[in-house]
């Protein structure tokens, strides 16, 4: 097969779609869960935020392990773990009441933390896989293809989960989603290898294409040429990597804000029932499905056209976040549901436009440490997965839903400022 790497990327897309359906399912099941266990808005925000505590540590450990043990080991371990935890989520309330003295929230909290730990390694492992399987000239494209499952998964979560909940219980939903994850793990174990050199399906022609340095820029590094003696703590001496991490934080804050709170926002502010959310919940993610893909292509096109990674990565990300911030700033002053949904869709589309950039910067700068540096990046970035849902619960309870979008603007501005200091691919300053 001449393009087996694209089959591998397709499998990753399927996995990230399952991954994001798993994450988003609880937001659509919130009405039934809240009604059954009596959670208030602040408690519910905390439950959503518990995921992030585990996610931070899972991403850090997963990235380091991917460098040491290889991405295949991490994929199989993490995929099996999160699928089993997803099944256990069906019994979270009962677990809490049985073990933690009648506290249902403790049961949900524990399993949300475990769910976060097991899902945490995924994106740093995607980055490690791309570093091993992608030629330098297509890093932006393959990163975008690998990440397109995020908005696609969020998009189809709305009709799948909302439709399912109209005919069956939220408990059965979690069980079925967990089983789907286990099926993916079984297939992946048979088709994937850490390096294309180890895979019988990869032809010599394709391998030469992957390892080719044709069209590479002078500042770009490859798996073979980059100094592998670099230590994990060198990350914090690199303004490139630290700035990129802060920029990515802004993206992740807005991403999780929309993923976790949109269903409840629509139900509370506009009084929509669950059967209406199957299509309304899709709208914010429609544009993102296109921009997540074309953003990677546009970044690689700018790289080729200008020969300047700062323009192709940093300035490109800044432009997208500026446009997103403008959209979210307008929403609190808009009272039409049609206008609100359009602005959410456009704003989220611009947020996802540079999604692949944050991972491409790591690969461009330190391909041999992509797993470790990706894990460190994701650890700090994923503080947003705690802060966004938890802070939103507090803001909504005290000041209303308009503050939810103001916080998205602030997060976007943080990202914009940070990316101004990112010069991708330049010689790592960590040893100087």
Give residue spans per PLM region.
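Central cavity-lining transmembrane alpha-helices of secondary-active solute carriers
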Residues: 49-64, 282-295
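Helix-loop-helix hairpin linking two adjacent transmembrane segments in secondary transporters
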Residues: 150-199
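Extracytoplasmic gate region of multi-pass secondary transporters
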Residues: 26-27, 236-293, 355, 359, ...
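Extracytoplasmic
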Residues: 7-39, 258-263
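Cytoplasmic helix-loop-helix junction between adjacent transmembrane helices
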Residues: 111-150
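C-terminal transmembrane helical hairpin of 12-TM major facilitator-type secondary transporters
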Residues: 310-357
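C-terminal ends and interior cores of transmembrane alpha-helices
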Residues: 80-101, 319-335
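A late C-terminal transmembrane helix in Major Facilitator Superfamily
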Residues: 363-398
